[in-house]
């Protein structure tokens, strides 16, 4: 990703010269990563895997990689956060990141990334933090369009044994919220200005449609709601945001 310094808009770039021949997964180089960066980069990898899985352009190989990545993250991220020198947890998180990368490189991502890119470009919000906060919010906003695949993930990873897709999907999203909570990841993002949201939503919508095979297409109006749902509101902003019922 690159950021246009004039427009503060992020763009994806790619070229065969940028594609590595090898990926070296050496856990020791991650031992010094601070807990909060461990948490948010780990949730970023989780976002890669989940968005690759629930999109409408998947293949058996990418689904398999995504599921393995999700399971590894569920099993190891908290340990890596608690103890940065846990070699086993660090090794499994590196593998999870790699697998999630192979999955989304072929099957793409979704609205979580589209919104996160706009926030990073405009405000410099760290990408992993933006994804961490947005992931459960947008998965919930997808509603029934994502229930079947989220429910399948919930059952495959042992999060739910419910036969009802809506219930299993809800338990999966709740598990993600609890992961964020356990690693002190906030529920909102500071600095989002009301006057910027329509422009940011247009950027995100243009990125998601037609670039990403998202579970459901929203349009700018629906996308705007995602910014309000994660917008940190202080006392000066509260009255201005009262017109947006999706934001407390």
Q: Where are the regions that the model predicts?
A:
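C-terminal catalytic subdomain
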Residues: 107-171, 177
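Short helix-capping/linker segments at secondary-structure and domain boundaries
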Residues: 53-59, 107-109, 141-148, 234-238
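Hydrophobic faces of stable alpha-helices that mediate helix-helix packing
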Residues: 43, 47, 67-70, 74, ...
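A ubiquitous short alpha-helical element
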Residues: 33-35, 57-62, 136-138, 161-162, ...
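C-terminal charged capping/lid subdomain of soluble metabolic enzymes
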Residues: 150, 160-248
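Amphipathic alpha-helical interaction segments
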Residues: 64-68, 72, 92-95, 114-117, ...
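Carboxylate- and glycine-rich phosphate/diphosphate-binding segment that chelates Mg2+/Mn2+
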Residues: 1-107, 194
